[in-house]
């Protein structure tokens, strides 16, 4: 268990999220489980699980059964709330107001053109997929303090000539 409190649903974004988010976050808070602990129990990446909680990812039938077990939510409730397609990209206002989320936005603002140029030089004309994609968050510690390490891994998709 982490020495930090578990993440809960922020009231300001709750109205923009599906009912499943409220159900999942309520159970997460009640059980005092981190996304890492839930991910381990479900057998998924913690970012994928968090995205599912925020309505930004689709749950498989296996995910639903595992979430039901770890969070003590009836499987029928999760099946009814998680069986549809996610409505991605609507949970945040732009630009973001939360300082941490804004820093991620700022990284793209500041380094996006540089990332694009370097990726084009390495791969050619195309884009990095956010569908054939994985990501993870790691914590590193050294003599200067604690560091957040975010890895983004997306399949390279070259533009087609036509």
Curated annotation (Swiss-Prot):
Organism domain of life: Eukaryota
Annotated CDD domains: Cyanase_C
EC number: 4.2.1.104
Reactions mediated catalytically: cyanate + hydrogencarbonate + 3 H(+) = NH4(+) + 2 CO2
Single GO biological process annotation from the record: cyanate metabolic process
Keyword Cell wall biogenesis/degradation in record: no
Cited function: Catalyzes the reaction of cyanate with bicarbonate to produce ammonia and carbon dioxide.
Record's protein name: Cyanate hydratase
Gene from which the chain derives: CYN1
